[in-house]
From Swiss-Prot:
InterPro entries for this protein: Trm112-like
Natural source organism: Cereibacter sphaeroides (strain ATCC 17025 / ATH 2.4.3) (Rhodobacter sphaeroides)
Coiled-coil regions listed in the entry: none
Name of this chain's protein: UPF0434 protein Rsph17025_2896
Any GO CC annotation of this UniProt entry: cytosol
Superkingdom field: Bacteria
Family label: Belongs to the UPF0434 family.
Transmembrane segments: none
Cysteine pairings via disulfide bonds: none
Amino acid sequence: MTESPQFDRRMLEALVCPVSQSGLSYDAERQELVSRQARLAFPIRDGIPIMLVSEAREL
């Protein structure tokens, strides 16, 4: 079984929340990027952040 690719934390410098345009934090355990201001968590799949509101989990 192969592991899925790791998220490149350097992406955090370039990515912002599509709703609030605020910064994001990385939750390694859940593999999500979290926008505390918008109260949304965006999934990371195969090392790629899915920055669609329709895919986000409400906090």
